[in-house]
Amino acid sequence: MAIQSKYTNTQVEALISELLAVLAKHQAPTDLSLMVLGNCVTHLLENKVPSESRQAVAEQFAKALVKSVK
């Protein structure tokens, strides 16, 4: 989603591949997959982002997500 990233494409693609493999292993339908991934995002925001930054980070993430599907 990011235009520039401090992470390599290899790092990003490896994580994507592993996450999708887990969803496939569990034969998770699209709605369940999106729900689980959304809950993961919420978990990361609540546990890894300082409370004073959460709203802004969540909004940036949401904007990037919308932009990525246009």
Swiss-Prot record:
Transmembrane segments: none annotated. InterPro entries: UPF0352 (IPR009857), YejL_sf (IPR023202). It holds the Pfam family DUF1414. It comes from the Bacteria. Belongs to the UPF0352 family. This is UPF0352 protein Sden_2336. The lineage of its organism: Bacteria, Pseudomonadati, Pseudomonadota, Gammaproteobacteria, Alteromonadales.
